[in-house]
Amino acid sequence: MATTQFPHHYDVALAWEGGHDGTALTAGPRPRIEGGAPPEFDGKDAWWSPEHLLLSSLSLCLMTTFQAVAGKAGLPIRHYDSRAEARLDRTPTGLGFTGLVLHVTVKVGSADEIERARHLLIKAKSHCIVANALMPPVHLDASVAAE
């Protein structure tokens, strides 16, 4: 059952056994995630890196926020998919993200709903907790079409 009481609290545990092996991330009853450095920093390609987890969080946050906003507006969504990209580069203060882009494709039931869905995507981005926590600002590249 959803609650609107605030504040909400979230907890993640990390266990590292030393060496250059990955770590295990756990959060209550959720599946364990094996993570570590990305290949660019001598990690393994099979590990979930902090960078990939951040983009996953951004993608999932926008989708769930859009579902909530569209649901409250009474707009049925037929299909949603997204792909997130980040550019990591040297900055005056060290390594940092210099670009974050979310490519989103949405399908609605009719052409009459396309502009409404675009508006609701923009609204969802403005309410997305993860997007609001990131620097630089997230660029939304949205494509909405009717089925």
Per-region residue spans from a language model:
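Extended beta-strand/beta-hairpin segments
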Residues: M1-S56, Q67-E147
